[in-house]
Amino acid sequence: MKIGFIGFGNMAQALAHGLVRGKAVEAGNIGACARDRAKLQRNTEPHGFRAFDDAASVAEFADIVVVAVKPY
């Protein structure tokens, strides 16, 4: 199963790490996109998560998509 996050702030990162620690999903099967590409790469690459440029790419990659953005 592949899980994608639209938005990868503190809550999304906590969920992603918990899924990997709990052995529910392998790190390579987690992908995310966010507004700040540099920050996204800093928060994904060291952990083996995949970084995407946009929400459409995340949706194409994932079986499950989590929308983790603030409701501005």
Predicted regions and their residues:
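NAD(P)+-binding Rossmann beta1-loop-alpha1 motif at the extreme N-terminus of oxidoreductases
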Residues: 1-56, 60
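N-terminal Rossmann-like NAD(P) cofactor-binding module of classical short-chain dehydrogenase/reductase
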Residues: 65-66
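Glycine-rich, N-terminal phosphate-binding loop of Rossmann-like dinucleotide-binding domains
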Residues: 69
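Active-site beta-alpha loop architecture of Rossmann-like, nucleotide-cofactor-dependent enzymes
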Residues: 72
